[in-house]
Amino acid sequence: MVCKGCGTNCKCQDTKCGDNCACNQDCKCVCKNGPKDQCCKSK
């Protein structure tokens, strides 16, 4: 999914988070649940 969780001032066009990820304030994919090595993969 596209990184929608960032604020409007964040440029996240290139960031895609996996299904179990959310976007943090730095436009990085962060885990919502599950092991970190499985949930946060860029697509």
Swiss-Prot record:
GO terms for molecular function: metal ion binding. The keyword Oxidoreductase does not apply. It comes from the Eukaryota. GO terms for biological process: cellular detoxification; cellular detoxification of metal ion; response to metal ion. InterPro entries: Metalthion_5. Keywords: Cadmium, Copper, Metal-binding, Zinc. All cysteine residues are arranged in C-X-C groups. These are thought to be the metal-binding sites in other metallothioneins. Belongs to the metallothionein superfamily. Type 5 family. This protein binds cations of several transition elements. Thought to be involved in metal ion homeostasis. This is Metallothionein-3. It comes from Drosophila melanogaster. The gene is MtnC.
